[in-house]
Amino acid sequence: MLLSAQGCAPASSAAEGGGTHGLTISDARAAYDSYLQASNAAAAQGNQVQGLALAADAQWAVLHAQYTALASEGTPVPQYKYGTPIFYVPALAGYPQWFMVATTRTPITAAGAATRTIMAFERSAAGQPWTLNGTAALNQALPAIATDRDGYAVAVSRSDPGLLLPPDVVGASQAGVVDEGPTNPSAAVIASGPLTTGLYAAQSAQSSSDTAHGWYYQWLLEGSPFEQFGLRTTDGGALVLYGMYLNTTTEHPGLVRGSPIPVPASFTPLLAAPTEVGYHAVYANWTFQYAAIDPPASAKNAKIQVIAGGGGPSYGHAY
């Protein structure tokens, strides 16, 4: 069944799968098709109520900011054209139900190339609508997913002891490297890459640039309360999806009043009032969805690889 419709099981905060297929691939495909139609229609119409009703967790935070930018500056909410989907459907009997889709996504409303994207959908309870909880652009191929005899995948719990790290601390370990770089102890288990040491380098460069202006720059990648999902891989590891916040501050030392600190352009529409000026500080916070490969504990010299990321600005403030 590993064709254009592929079965899989979740590793969110819900328990591991018990082998019952309460959600079929046909159900997932119908929910996915409905989402594509409704989300693009809401974006085209600028219908914030309808658009946000289709999202949750990291996706809601990013989408809320996009609709805020539409209202404040007329910036169109992104619309996309999607390629052929591959479905990963959980084998859980109860709720929450969820599934993942791997596909290509090309912007319609702005220039941009197609990106290979993984999307996580969830229905929290019977009678509740399906929501898109997060999207992440892949920077390498997805790992092979282990499946049962019916083609459905094996769920991975948040505390699985058979992995290099329990899935619920993968995000915190990534954050250690992003916040402090390769000298952080987490670098022993987190591989270098654009979403780990690369993000640290980018933030460090921003800090150096701000220091040259006489400002003090701080950043912190931290965990979120968002649902976490995971799939067993064929080598005994796991593919883990999770959400994170990246909070940044640029301030005059001691928060004394000084010359205005510029607000990043992508955050200007998110200010509560256009009169906000960074005489003291500017806060620019992001919300991200990540996907990582967590190798089996038995793998020698293995490290966790963060293979996908996506998100955007979610909060801005200046005073």
Name the predicted role of every residue range.
Residues 56, 126, 245:
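Residue-level marker of positions within ordered structural domains that often coincide
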Residues 76-78, 157, 264-269:
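Glycine-rich loops and low-complexity Gly/Arg-rich segments
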Residues 69-115, 215-261:
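Surface-exposed, charged secondary-structure patches
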Residues 1-103, 111, 115:
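An N-terminus-focused feature that recognizes amino-terminal "leader" regions
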Residues 108-164, 233-241, 266, 276-319:
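Short beta-strand edge/turn micro-motifs at domain boundaries
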Residues 254-282:
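Mixed-charge, low-complexity intrinsically disordered segments
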Residues 19-70, 144-214:
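Core segments of small alpha/beta cavity-forming domains
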